Amino acid sequence: MSSLNSVLPSNACAEIIEGKDKVHNVVILMHGLGDSHKSFANMAKNVPLPNTSYISLRGPYRLPLDFENPGGNWMWGEDVHFDQNGELQSEADFSKSFTMISNLIGNLLSYGILSSRIFFFGFGQGAMVALYSCYKLSTKYQLGGIFSFGGTLPLSITLPNHPFHVPVYLFEKRLHCSCSEYEESRLRKTFKPFHLTCWNRDDKTDMPSSPREWYTFVQSISKHLYIHNTLFEDAIPLTSF
């Protein structure tokens, strides 16, 4: 297989962290509102997974605010909205982001990656776009799963009659601090199986902030990864061990 650089759509800006071994799994990283792909790329280098490559995407729109981020300030939606408290809202028009992700998925399939081995790891608005994209693509593909750190479904979407079979893992620093009970119920009606993990802390963000919390993520995604055993020719599930 050639380099994964060939799968990037022409309008995508991303950093690829390729696995050392043959790639069977791809994790698409999607940063939060006002961040960039650089921070998630650095994170991926510290969380290597067997037979897995990361693609850290950058949001297609520049945020018209300066947070002095070395990688710039980017967002996934075309417009910016503020709530009644003056806080930035995550929900926006994600049409351009969805087209980019849809093209990326198609290119990964052409590259030889199975749809069930394509995963999303997103924070905040990035997680919302990941959930939105999987909602729209699940009638066409069987995707591997979504790891959402504080991200919820856009309220504008109509829930399906039956949940899509896409594993969703939602992580929060404290129960319902980022995802209300109503938003959780919408996720449960849209995807299954659904798993909720609460870090039970008030500081920092919904992202993992300790080795124990990172282990929880690795343990969760490992249930769905495929690794290649050098003693055999076939790829086997990590859960077979």
Curated annotation (Swiss-Prot):
Signal sequence segment: none
Entry keyword set: Hydrolase
Highest taxon, organism lineage: Eukaryota
Enzyme Commission (EC) number: 3.1.-.-
The family this protein is said to belong to: Belongs to the AB hydrolase superfamily. AB hydrolase 2 family.
GO molecular function annotations of the record: carboxylic ester hydrolase activity; palmitoyl-(protein) hydrolase activity
Name the UniProt record assigns to this protein: Uncharacterized hydrolase C9G1.08c
One cellular component (GO) term of this entry: cytoplasm
Entry-linked Pfam families: Abhydrolase_2
TM helices/strands, residue ranges: none
